[in-house]
Amino acid sequence: MFLFGCSKEDVVTPKKEFTLSIDSVLTQSGMRSLPKDKNGFYHLKLDETKNQTIHRITGRILLNGKQPTPSEKVEWESNLFWHLKRNDTIATITKSYINYFTGQYTIVKLPPMIASKDELVPTINGSSYSGTNGEFNTMIAPIYTMKGDTMIVKASNYTSKLFDIKKIVLE
């Protein structure tokens, strides 16, 4: 006994078309993009009063023109790193409170956080996930001694095999 089956319709697998782009490197306020030159390089003025200059990068990943569900992981890379040496001060911490006995506003300087070992510190957060309308964000934090360097930022997505690269001149 033999059994055979036929169908008029082939099973159609939906086509997955991804798009991925880094849309902008935002100003400190986050309200607009940093200026770009004719070569498409962003220009970031480093804050000489602080060790790190923190800025947000935003982009978008879409699946067939729509927000991907579930969210897609975006991995970030940068060509720049800096060294945190053992016994360097990582942060100074202050605590502020109202003294309940005197009623005075009091600020207390706590002991600083000290690095316990040498570390290589990236200038960009390593990953983020897409959200509403496929938007994703990350933070960069180049340090002032990188002035004159060009930061190369890469965003990539494993599922789609797509990536985008932007260059930021540190001034």
Enumerate the predicted regions with their spans.
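The feature marks long extracellular or luminal low-complexity segments
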Residues: 6-171
